């Protein structure tokens, strides 16, 4: 199952994302967001993730995963999706930081972490992601 948010494809199931990342030799960018209450999360999506340049970079390099934690009843996620997101939070976001963005290897090892909105232009964020992948010896 995928969620369309602007141009890039965002997965909501980490298992599926890992399978794709392993098959296509990509890294995973995992974003924890509060889409209907977290201002910095909304700005991060608008200023970086929905940027056409970042989208093109992500489409060729990354598998994007979004773990969303909306608060409004009308935006509530299905129970099974809430459980998947809770499991991801237990594993990668135990402090409950929003937004939190992690660059992972295909097998789930954390390479880089951005706590909050990175506060940079989309191209600079893409360069940070690429530098972390290159430093790890990735593609």
Question: Which residues are covered by each model-predicted region?
Answer:
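Thiol-based oxidoreductase modules, predominantly thioredoxin-like and allied folds used
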Residues: 8-11, 54-83
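A short beta-strand-turn-helix
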Residues: 10-28, 58
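Short active-site neighborhood of thiol/selenol oxidoreductases, capturing the structured segment around
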Residues: 24-38
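Loop/turn elements at helix/coil->beta-strand transitions in domains of secreted/extracellular proteins
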Residues: 24-28, 60-66, 97-99, 106-109
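Solvent-exposed loop/turn segments at secondary-structure junctions
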Residues: 35-38, 47-48, 69-73, 96, ...
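The canonical Cys-X-X-Cys-His
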Residues: 38-42, 101
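Typically the conserved alpha-helix immediately C-terminal to a functionally engaged Cys/Sec
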Residues: 41-57
């Amino acid at each position: 199952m995928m969620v369309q948010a602007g141009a890039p494809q965002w997965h909501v199931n980490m298992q599926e994302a890992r399978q794709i990342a392993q098959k296509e030799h990509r890294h995973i960018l995992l974003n924890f967001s509060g889409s209907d209450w977290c201002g910095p999360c909304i700005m991060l999506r608008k200023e970086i993730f929905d940027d056409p340049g970042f989208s093109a970079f992500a489409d060729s390099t990354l598998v994007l995963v979004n773990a969303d934690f909306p608060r409004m009843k009308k935006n509530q996620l299905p129970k099974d999706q809430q459980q998947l997101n809770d499991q991801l939070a237990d594993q990668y976001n135990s402090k409950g930081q929003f937004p939190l963005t992690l660059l992972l290897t295909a097998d789930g090892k954390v390479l880089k972490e951005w706590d909050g909105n990175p506060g940079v232009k989309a191209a600079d964020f893409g360069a940070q992601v690429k530098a972390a992948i290159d430093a790890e010896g990735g593609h």
